[in-house]
A protein has these predicted regions:
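RNA pseudouridine synthases
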Residues: 1-125
Length: 125
């Protein structure tokens, strides 16, 4: 990523027949706004590849949102061949933290986890 942090706002259309989401320019039936913020928390270069580790906060939760918003800007996720990555392997997308208000106790519950020590995660953790 060129910027250390930022906010991405796009209009997305999900084609259910292809199971693929596209960034579009105009509002029409089925198009939804997608918003996320990101912060680069790590950067590595290996074998000529420049990789960034990002902390992402979704303001909306659209199908393939993270994948398509970054790919549309030329930054496909590692291993995400559907959205333009030339690298084979598992998609490098991991939910490190999730929190929510428990409906029974009405208290905030938080879970943290690091990814397994496999490529590309082993470069950062």
């Amino acid at each position: 990523m060129a910027e250390e942090n930022g906010r991405l706002v796009d209009l997305l259309f999900h084609d259910k027949t292809k199971n693929k989401t596209y960034v579009v320019k105009k509002q029409r039936k089925g198009v939804k706004e997608a918003i996320l913020t990101y912060e680069r928390v790590g950067a590595k270069e290996t074998e000529g590849l420049k990789l960034s580790l990002l902390k992402i906060k979704l303001e909306t939760g659209r199908t393939h949102q993270i994948r398509v918003q970054f790919a549309s800007r030329g930054f496909s996720l590692f291993g995400d061949r559907k959205y333009g990555s030339k690298l084979a392997g598992d998609i490098a997308l991991f939910s490190h933290k999730i929190s929510f208000v428990c409906p029974e106790s009405n208290k905030r519950v938080e879970f943290l986890e690091n990814p397994a020590s496999i490529t590309p995660w082993d470069l950062f953790f």
